[in-house]
From Swiss-Prot:
NCBIfam families on file: frr
Name assigned to this protein: Ribosome-recycling factor
InterPro entries reported for this sequence: Ribosome_recyc_fac (IPR002661), Ribosome_recyc_fac_dom (IPR023584), RRF_sf (IPR036191)
Domain of life: Bacteria
Pfam families: RRF (PF01765)
Family according to the record: Belongs to the RRF family.
GO BP: cytoplasmic translational termination
Gene for this chain: frr
Length: 187
């Protein structure tokens, strides 16, 4: 019998999407080192719409603990400055013309532990998303088998493949989390 209409590559793509979202979220966590991705979640009210910071300015890292934001439009400097202040990143920009300089302060141990907890929360959300994709895949397989388009042997084989993909993706999430945790806790 055929394996019906089951697309394993789509399932893996959806699982990798959860990993991608996790990496984006973890990239926004401040680790004590300057990173241009730290400012990625910030949006600015510009030209009548909300725009990401990287569409109104260039973010660079001139030093290990310094971010430089070069705003392209002089009229947008105050809006960018306000958005950075209001972003809950704990950063206070120093404005010099169209350039905003952001000193990244040292993190104390308590704040590092809080960031680790946030990272764990993000990772758990990614794992839940992967498990949802797994459940959707398994439900689809069972439906295809129930409709008679797949043999029970094919169901077992594909179920194992789905579980293997799930396990690999969760291992990747754990590895990504461990890497970020190490980065956060390193002084």
């Amino acid at each position: 019998m055929t394996t019906g209409t089951f697309d394993m590559s789509d399932l893996k793509r959806r699982m990798q999407g959860a990993v991608g979202v996790l990496r984006d979220e973890l990239g926004g966590l401040r680790t004590g080192r300057a990173s241009a991705s730290l400012l990625d979640p910030i949006t600015i009210e510009a030209y009548g719409a909300r725009m990401p910071l990287n569409q109104v300015a260039t973010v660079s890292v001139p030093e290990a603990r310094l971010l430089s934001v070069q705003v392209w439009d002089r009229g947008m400097v105050s809006a960018v400055e306000k958005a950075i202040r209001d972003s809950n990143l704990g950063l206070n920009p120093n404005t010099e013309g169209q350039v905003l300089r952001l000193r990244i302060p040292e993190l104390n141990q308590e704040r590092r532990q809080e960031l680790v907890k946030v990272a764990h929360k993000y990772a758990e959300a990614a794992k839940v998303a992967v498990r949802h994709v797994r459940r959707d895949g398994m439900d689809h397989l069972k439906k295809v088998e129930k409709d008679g388009e797949m043999s029970s042997d094919d169901l077992d084989r594909l179920s194992k493949d789905v579980q293997k993909a799930t396990d690999e993706t969760i291992a990747e999430i754990d590895q990504t989390l461990a890497q970020k945790e190490k980065e956060i806790l390193s002084v």
